[in-house]
């Protein structure tokens, strides 16, 4: 008699679409389109952005739209955890900083003004850091992760939470409003975020068992076992976060050193 897990795998295999087929999440396609439309309106009414800023913002919107409306979505929600984790880092770690960097200073000032006290509170490092970490770990809890994969409404909610948390996390890194942080504070903030979030990827890398029952029962691609799939997902997550945070922290470290040099020159010039 086949085991319950084998039976579940057979049912999923029957219902799973071809890995190369497109999946669509219209809500994120609409949101990405609306973001670009709003950006164009701001560019006309507030401040004309440089081509570089336009490219950054559009790339951020495209990452959200394409990661959730493509074969990547199909493989992520029907076959492999590593592809789902790739989706998550694209919408949580890549797209948000690109969107924030794509805004001009005048655009950020307008957003900060309209965000009012709520944005001022949410973008305080001591508030946003634990919120960001709570969303990051909460979304990846096995019980919620497995349930969301079987209930699209919750999966969409989780993806939306990752995007929103990413935006408020990266806002104080690249925007001086509503709070102007020193380079030293931004450096510590980013370091604490990386250190705090790394435990998840390390657990995925070194665990001897698969955490997510959905992917244990899912049809396999390219001969990847559930455990190997999970280990690769952890390596991917850890590697990309290391790269993203290293680049950001390196920038602010150079800024800090430059500020120290300027202060020293000012003292010597007295």
Predicted regions and their residues:
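Alpha-helical membrane segments of multi-pass proteins
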Residues: 5-270
């Amino acid at each position: 008699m086949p085991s319950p897990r084998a039976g579940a795998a057979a049912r999923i295999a029957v219902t799973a679409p071809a890995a190369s087929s497109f999946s669509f999440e219209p809500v994120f396609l609409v949101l990405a389109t609306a973001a670009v439309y709003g950006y164009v309106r701001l560019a006309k009414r507030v401040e004309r952005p440089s081509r570089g800023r336009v490219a950054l913002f559009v790339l951020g919107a495209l990452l959200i739209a394409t990661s959730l409306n493509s074969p990547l979505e199909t493989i992520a929600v029907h076959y492999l955890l590593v592809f789902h984790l790739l989706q998550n880092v694209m919408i949580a770690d890549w797209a948000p900083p690109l969107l924030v960097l794509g805004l001009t200073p005048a655009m950020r000032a307008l957003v900060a003004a309209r965000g009012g006290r709520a944005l001022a509170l949410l973008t305080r490092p001591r508030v946003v850091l634990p919120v960001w970490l709570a969303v990051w770990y909460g979304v990846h809890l096995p019980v919620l992760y497995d349930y969301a994969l079987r209930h699209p409404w919750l999966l969409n909610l989780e993806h939306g939470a990752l995007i929103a948390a990413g935006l408020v996390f990266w806002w104080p890194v690249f925007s001086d409003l509503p709070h102007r942080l020193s380079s030293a504070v931004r450096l510590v903030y980013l370091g604490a975020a990386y250190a705090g979030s790394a435990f998840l990827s390390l657990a995925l890398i070194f665990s001897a068992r698969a955490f997510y029952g959905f992917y244990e029962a899912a049809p396999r691609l390219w001969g990847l076992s559930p455990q190997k799939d999970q280990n690769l997902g952890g390596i991917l997550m850890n590697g990309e976060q290391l790269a993203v945070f290293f680049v950001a922290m390196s920038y602010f470290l150079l800024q800090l050193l430059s500020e120290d040099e300027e202060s020293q020159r000012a003292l010597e010039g007295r």
